[in-house]
């Protein structure tokens, strides 16, 4: 069997969105499925990671990208004043009117490239992975033009997205366009793969024509091979990843400031938004706060492994934060260091932390609960009682990325 995987994010792009398509393309060939990948040639990535390499097992193809820069609005405006800031805001306004998202500008080159590959290589099925939501439009177009089955892989919800700022008029205006995409996926995809039950429920709400399966993200244990934990002189708690949407570090920062713990250092790999940096400065945290720039994937894994604990922050956002256990939690689980999870208590991430015994769950806005959890982890560290490897062999196998890709392969072969 031959498949074409269409993704906006692929090495040398960096960031969390790269890992699922990268690992899919890495492991599918070992299961007897010839894998072709179509990715942009230069999408002006939000992050670039030259240490990440495309898998040699897959055939990687590129289609020209002519769209806007893939940067967060806050980063686009950071440090700009006067006319430069006005021009940057105008560019952002252009991005915001593109429906369903700015990456729709890749379609004029991506769709013809995908169709050529299908016909030239004898592709049997196309997989699109989103976000960006517009990747689903490519899948629908390829199916219509070639007749091959389409599998829509949803790494995040299309409508029920906890990180989207629903209080903003521009976002509300996009809701109808996004609903049309969900309806398209439900009506046209031969199969839908979702990383959580709640995302699959979003599709089922629109009476899908094809099968819907939940295949969560997985742990890449091999990525941590050779990375060691060495107990530090201070209690190091690490957050890896960017802050966007409603993700809010302030309850944790307040809890740290009021904890009375002077030998704790909170490391934020990827930094904070400017407003949150200013907030943190007002708390007088001093050397208890370490802000690091965007790091390569490998360096971020080193930090996660060599930490007394890792910090997971997910917003509630009127219940939408329960939708998906961020891919970051699987990195944290693979690092096998305790997790302080400030997440919706009834959500998928909280369930994973509890089931694996990986750490402590508190509500994302519960400063008192976060402070008590931090003090408790610190006390266990002082007593030499922090676990270093808490997953059983059965849990490791069930959570592994290889097991997840095997499920996808089974689905593909059934089409």
Tell what function each PLM region has.
Residues 190, 304-323:
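Acidic donor-binding loop of glycosyltransferase active sites
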Residues 270, 275-301:
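Nucleotide-activated donor-binding/catalytic signature segment of Leloir-type glycosyltransferases, i.e.
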Residues 230-247, 253-256, 404:
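Conserved donor-binding/catalytic core segment of Leloir-type glycosyltransferases
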Residues 198, 218:
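Carbohydrate-associated surface elements
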Residues 364-369, 382-414:
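A charged, aromatic-enriched C-terminal amphipathic alpha-helix characteristic of glycosyltransferases
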């Amino acid at each position: 069997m031959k498949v074409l995987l269409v993704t906006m994010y692929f090495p040398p792009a960096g960031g969390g969105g790269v890992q699922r398509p990268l690992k899919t393309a890495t492991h599918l060939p070992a299961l007897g499925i010839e894998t072709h990948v179509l990715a942009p040639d230069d999408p002006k990535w939000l992050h670039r990671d030259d240490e990440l390499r495309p898998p040699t097992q897959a055939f990687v193809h590129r289609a020209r990208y002519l769209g806007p820069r893939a940067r967060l609005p806050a980063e686009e405006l950071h440090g700009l004043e006067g006319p430069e800031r006005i021009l940057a805001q105008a560019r952002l306004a252009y991005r915001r009117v593109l429906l369903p998202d700015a990456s729709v500008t890749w379609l004029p080159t991506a769709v013809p490239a995908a169709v050529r590959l299908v016909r030239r290589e004898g592709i049997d099925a196309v997989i699109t992975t989103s976000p960006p939501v517009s990747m689903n439009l490519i899948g629908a177009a390829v199916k219509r033009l070639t007749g091959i089955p389409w599998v829509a892989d949803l790494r995040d919800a299309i409508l029920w997205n906890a990180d989207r700022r629903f209080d903003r008029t521009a976002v509300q205006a996009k809701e109808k366009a996004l609903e049309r995409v969900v309806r398209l996926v439900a009506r046209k995809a031969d199969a839908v793969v979702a990383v959580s039950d709640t995302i699959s429920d979003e599709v089922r709400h629109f009476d899908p024509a094809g099968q819907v399966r939940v295949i969560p993200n997985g742990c890449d244990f091999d990525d941590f091979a050779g990375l060691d934990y060495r107990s530090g002189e201070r209690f190091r708690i690490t957050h890896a990843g960017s802050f966007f949407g409603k993700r809010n570090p302030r309850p944790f920062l307040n809890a740290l400031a009021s904890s009375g713990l002077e030998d704790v250092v909170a490391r934020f790999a990827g930094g904070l938004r400017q407003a949150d940096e200013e907030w943190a400065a007002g708390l007088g945290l001093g050397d208890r706060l370490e802000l690091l720039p965007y790091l390569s994937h490998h360096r971020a894994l080193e930090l996660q492994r060599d930490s007394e604990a890792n910090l997971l922050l997910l917003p509630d956002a009127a219940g939408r934060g329960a939708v998906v256990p961020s891919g970051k939690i699987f990195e944290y689980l693979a690092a096998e260091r305790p997790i302080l999870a400030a997440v919706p208590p009834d959500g998928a991430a909280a369930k994973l932390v509890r089931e694996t015994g990986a750490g402590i769950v508190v509500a994302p806005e519960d400063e008192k609960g976060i402070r008590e959890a931090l003090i408790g982890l610190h006390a266990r560290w002082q007593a030499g009682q922090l676990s270093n490897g808490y997953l059983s062999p059965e849990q490791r196998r069930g959570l592994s990325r290889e097991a997840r890709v095997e499920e996808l392969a089974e689905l593909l072969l059934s089409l």
